[in-house]
Amino acid sequence: MHSDELLVEILVEELPAQALLNEYKEMPKKLHALFNKRALEVGNIEIFYTPRRLCLLIKDFPLLTQETKEEFFGPPVKIACNHQDKTQGLNALGLGFYQKLGLKDHQYFQTAFKNNKEVLYHAKIHEKEPTKDLIMPIVLEFLEGLNFGKSMRWGNVEKSFIRPIHNICVLFNGEDFSGIEVKEYGFKTKQATKVHRQEGFDFIQVDSPKAYFEVLEKNHVILDPKKREAKILQEIKELETKHHIIVETDRDLLDEVVAITEYPSALLGEFDKAFLKLPSEIIITSMKENQRYFATFCQKSQEESPTLHNGFIVVSNAINKDKQKIILGNQKVLKARLSDAVFFYENDLKKPLDNAPLESVVFVQGLGTLKDKMERESIIAQYLTQKYISSLNMPLEKALELVKRAVQIAKADLLSEVVYEFSELQGIMGYYYALKQNENELVALSVKEQYLPASENAPLPSSVFSSIVALSLKLDSLFSLFSVGKIPSGSKDPFALRRLSFGLLKIIAHYGLEFDLKADLKNLFQKVGVYQSFDLEILEKFLLERFHNLIDCNPSIIRSVLNTNERDIVKIIQKVKALKRFLDDPKNAQKKELLFSAFKRLANINKDRNPNESSEFSTNLFKEPKEHALFEAFNAIKMNAFESLDSKIEAYFGLHAPLEEYFKSVLVMDKDIEIQKNRKNFLWGVYQSFLEIGDIKEIAI
């Protein structure tokens, strides 16, 4: 037998769910790195967790390490030997090399060739050794390498960890790992585990992985988080069927309740229907954030959206048979929470949105207050309203009035009691307060949707009107933060400007709005007129970089379009997609090399040209028939008013044949300087015309 099953359990006090879930994804990679470091080839690594334990399971863990060879290369023989002659013995430099390796005289004078030079050399063979001696050092190094964000010390221990560690149980090949003193964390190891607290508090001896799993299963500990999740979902499904409800199984919440339970049970509780007068988002958020409850909805017809039901799902870790007692306890706690929410909500309704003291809240140090931000956003919103009035289906005067009002009250809910309690409800509460205070519905909805999209695949604002308010917020944040040097770098993006920029591009693309990243940014910067001066090209470049996340295609195609003067967001996307369609077309996919060979040569000829250089040429200086042929084909394209971008691209790429013929028979670098210049100018004109679509030299096929 060359391998056996290895199980390691690290017994801890309750681990914080979010910290555990974040680091759990990195654990297999970190463990593999430690094994590779010691040249250990292991089978599949499984890592299980409950709130009180981390368990590492490897089905095929080798009994012995591999025999390895470690090579050491020293100085060249010429400078390491007396009189530069290896028959004359080693000098101080040569002796020093071997002495550092702890070698004796009779082992001197091994040499090898490296980089065509003979150098001093030694190969150290590491014999096979039992892996049992490596397990504890690896486990301790693994624990030290885990990053949960925060750690603590307890007693007089040497090392810190996220929570106190009480035992490390190692089960491998019948070896005895008990009684090992772990000074770092202040305990001696036991070949034992602990079970569900309601089953007992004492250690239970285990002598094999099989016995370990049997003890946990018998004592209400489901070690595998996937099995705990499956149990929760199955019980929720049964409750849905029995009570004719729909349960919203929020992914993040599901992960969290799996992480805080060892033997989960899904139970249905109820709250007073009177609380349903609250906006549903308050109830759902209160249940999720404060109590880790799942919301339930009334089951209606497929045509109707489900409405919130006065129930909730609590996932209990108790193995108490009296489930009703658990439910009643949770109902009592939720009642108190929702009573608080009613109090906050009713207090907020008494305060007019107009009177929110925005001037008392600093936006960002150096960028004024929320009132200052609101005033800047208002100027941007007025500009965008005039620009997009044709998409708003209302008179300009009315649109300007409504947009101004929307921006004026958009931040008022930030000072509300509900948002103070649940910051994720910003905008949403503003919507409800606006409706209650008889604001225009478009205005109220735009307040709700101003922060959209919240993530890459999240919903967008539902109208152009809401989009104007959302874009105003995003543009002001970008201008403001860039103007004071708060520019994302590396992985640091404290104000989430990358996500915000992506959302800005996505909104504009979705509604097909005209927005030029050079002209409109400059116009807005000047129109607002209060931002600190900074290079707008930095912001332009930052936004252009986001296109690589926005469009799913060959990055070189995106780069080719961005390398032109095109800065209209929608047109950039249209050109990228049109180029992608052309290159993905089966009839073109087979001849990409042929299509691009002439264009690449055209690009190389013009690579050093000044973009502002003249492209004037005269057909009177054409001497070769192929010059005229290329000119006629090119001129036909220039004169054509193409119905679509696709047909224009098709026509331009159709120039590859006359271009190939041109390069075969025409010497661009003619001895006659005037003819040479004319030919170069002509080809420069052809190349510049391509730049109306993309820079062909950037496309990698």
From Swiss-Prot:
Compartments in which it is found: Cytoplasm
Gene Ontology, cellular component aspect: cytosol
Pfam families: tRNA_synt_2f
GO MF, one annotated term: ATP binding
Keyword Nucleotide-binding annotated: yes
Enzyme Commission number, as recorded: 6.1.1.14
Catalytic activity: tRNA(Gly) + glycine + ATP = glycyl-tRNA(Gly) + AMP + diphosphate
A Gene Ontology BP annotation from the UniProt entry: glycyl-tRNA aminoacylation
Principal EC category: ligase
Keywords from the named record: Aminoacyl-tRNA synthetase, ATP-binding, Cytoplasm, Ligase, Nucleotide-binding, Protein biosynthesis
InterPro entries: Gly-tRNA-synth_bsu (IPR015944), Gly-tRNA-synth_heterodimer (IPR006194)
Quaternary state and interactors: Tetramer of two alpha and two beta subunits.
Family of the protein in this entry: Belongs to the class-II aminoacyl-tRNA synthetase family.
Protein name: Glycine--tRNA ligase beta subunit
Species annotation: Helicobacter pylori (strain ATCC 700392 / 26695)
